């Protein structure tokens, strides 16, 4: 029996953000929805609308603030009164008609900098005064990057699916410290990196390429886990050397009445650091292939996750 809570939002979504009190923020094309825990009912929600524009990216900021990137602006919003009302804190024009690649915008250095993913590299912005940002530098790269994870205060990992490489980048200078070749990424548009522990980072591979593990201290690839015809679109650390991945699994997992339906599912992994082994210990319920999917999130102080697929949001206990 499927134990997941399923919220049918009947519209495409792009990104989920966990809030305090286990409330859930959902980025749509031109609005943001805030659903209240524990029921996540669509009858009692906070809506933040952006008429006549499109939300190009979103990320959490400090103290219950969120940052929204539109075509031309950065907008900082504060959520108030237990996430039931909001106010616009700042609104600034940054780069006219600049869209983010894969809608990627992440916070760096404990919410003091922003990274904006561009078509040919990335931009770093400083918070020069509260909730006002200025350009620090642009880092150009011919093929651009797909996913990012900050591994130290001044060091970043990112990948380029076009080049089949993972890069370690020094953010101070900035420059590429080293790169690792032959890393095959099939769907680079979601969060394909995650920490496994303080020293190990995982990266989801393409339809046949499973999961890669990297030691961030030696900046080397240390493990390649493969499973026939299984690739991963999004990964998330869930603590204690455990992580989950959204697996594209063809017809291998889950159940469907339609023999032509291809399925996704959540796979659960544990990393054995002594033997450098990845062990799959659970496979979740299947769900139908969806063109639009989101990142995984884990709620603060609760043992449950959420994700979006095919116009539905799923909330699941771990």
Question: Where are the regions that the model predicts?
Answer:
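Short loop/turn segments that connect beta-strands within beta-propeller blades
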Residues: 37-40, 79-82, 127-130, 171-174, ...
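Repeated scaffold domains used in trafficking and secretory/extracellular systems
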Residues: 11-17, 52-61, 95-106, 141-151, ...
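A short beta-strand motif characteristic of beta-propeller blades
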Residues: 2-8, 43-49, 84-96, 131-139, ...
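Beta-strand-rich domains and repeat architectures in extracellular enzymes and scaffolds
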Residues: 7-30
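Residue-level signature of beta-propeller blades and closely related beta-rich strand-turn architectures
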Residues: 30, 72, 120, 162, ...
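Short, conserved, GDST-rich strand-edge loop motifs in beta-rich repeat architectures
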Residues: 247-263
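Blade-level signature of beta-propeller repeat domains, shared across WD40, Kelch, NHL, RCC1
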Residues: 291-318
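Short coil/turn segments that connect the beta-strands within blades of beta-propeller domains
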Residues: 21-23, 63-64, 111-112, 153-154, ...
């Amino acid at each position: 029996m499927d134990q997941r809570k399923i919220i049918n939002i009947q519209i495409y979504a792009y990104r989920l953000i966990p809030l305090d009190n286990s409330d859930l923020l959902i980025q749509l094309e031109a609005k943001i929805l805030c659903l209240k825990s524990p029921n996540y009912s669509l009858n009692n929600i906070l809506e933040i609308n952006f008429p006549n524009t499109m939300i190009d990216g979103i990320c959490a900021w400090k103290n219950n603030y969120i940052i929204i990137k539109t075509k031309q602006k950065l907008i900082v919003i504060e959520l108030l009164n237990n996430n039931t009302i909001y106010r616009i804190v700042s609104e600034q024009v940054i780069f006219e008609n600049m869209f983010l690649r894969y809608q990627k915008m992440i916070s760096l250095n404990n919410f003091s900098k922003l990274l904006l993913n561009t078509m040919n590299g990335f931009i770093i912005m400083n918070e020069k005064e509260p909730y006002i940002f200025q350009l620090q530098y642009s880092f150009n790269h011919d093929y651009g990057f797909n996913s990012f994870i900050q591994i130290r205060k001044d060091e970043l990992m990112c990948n380029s699916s076009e080049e089949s490489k993972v890069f370690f980048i020094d953010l101070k200078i900035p420059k590429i410290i080293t790169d690792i070749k032959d890393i095959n990424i099939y769907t680079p548009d979601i969060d394909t990196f995650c920490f496994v522990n303080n020293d190990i980072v995982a990266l989801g591979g393409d339809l046949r390429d499973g999961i890669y593990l990297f030691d961030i201290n030696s900046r080397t690839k240390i493990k390649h886990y493969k499973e026939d015809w299984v690739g991963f679109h999004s990964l998330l650390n869930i603590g204690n050397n455990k992580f989950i991945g959204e697996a594209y699994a063809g017809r291998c997992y889950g159940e469907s009445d339609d023999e032509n339906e291809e399925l996704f599912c959540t796979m659960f992994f544990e990393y054995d650091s002594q033997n450098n082994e990845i062990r799959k210990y659970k496979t979740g319920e299947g769900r139908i292939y969806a063109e639009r999917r989101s990142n995984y999130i884990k709620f603060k102080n609760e043992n449950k996750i959420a994700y979006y697929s095919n116009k539905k949001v799923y909330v699941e206990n771990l």
